[in-house]
């Protein structure tokens, strides 16, 4: 049975077109498909990505552990950086694409779309590494498009310029409209 995200009541007021996406109700369209596409390409579009699976991996050597599972060499990432990669099975077949957020060498947040990702990490985790599925505890909005930074800049006192906040990085000290965000 599909779950509602924290943003469902607001979205429900905007659309009656829903689909099950990884166990969560997600709007299939809010206004018009072409209009939404253009907004994302030309201005900005806000999307509920709560359904993406978030997994925290922590303990001594967490980064090295994750590096042995994803296709990208995430060992080269510094704290605050994000890497895009893939998970493959033992035959090299792609299971899922993912992002890996490095908080420290011992604290990693993984984001993918599939429940199998969490189970894979759990199954392969060596002693001392904890794997915690945190999807339900982490509502996830994604603002995408060329005007995204300008729109958010008016809602925070943090510098969100490309120079101060480069692409594929994250910070945990940012508030948007007074709400802490990750």
Regions found by a protein language model. Give the residues of each.
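Acidic, proline/glycine-enriched N-terminal capping motif
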Residues: 1-88, 93-95
């Amino acid at each position: 049975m599909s779950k509602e995200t924290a943003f469902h009541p607001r979205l429900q007021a905007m659309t009656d077109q829903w689909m099950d996406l990884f166990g969560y109700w997600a709007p299939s369209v809010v206004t018009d498909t072409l209009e939404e596409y253009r907004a994302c390409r030309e201005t900005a579009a806000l999307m509920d990505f709560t359904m993406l699976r978030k997994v925290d991996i922590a303990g001594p050597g967490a980064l090295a552990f994750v590096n042995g599972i994803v296709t990208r060499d995430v060992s080269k990432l510094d704290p605050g950086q994000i890497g895009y990669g893939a998970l493959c099975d033992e035959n090299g077949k792609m299971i899922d694409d993912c992002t890996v957020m490095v908080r420290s060498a011992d604290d990693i947040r993984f984001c993918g779309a599939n429940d199998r990702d969490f189970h894979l990490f759990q199954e392969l985790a060596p002693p001392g590494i904890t794997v915690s599925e945190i999807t339900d505890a982490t509502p996830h909005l994604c603002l995408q498009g060329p005007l995204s930074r300008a729109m958010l800049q008016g809602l925070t006192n943090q510098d969100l310029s490309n120079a101060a906040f480069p692409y594929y990085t994250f910070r945990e000290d940012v508030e948007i409209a007074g709400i802490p965000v990750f």
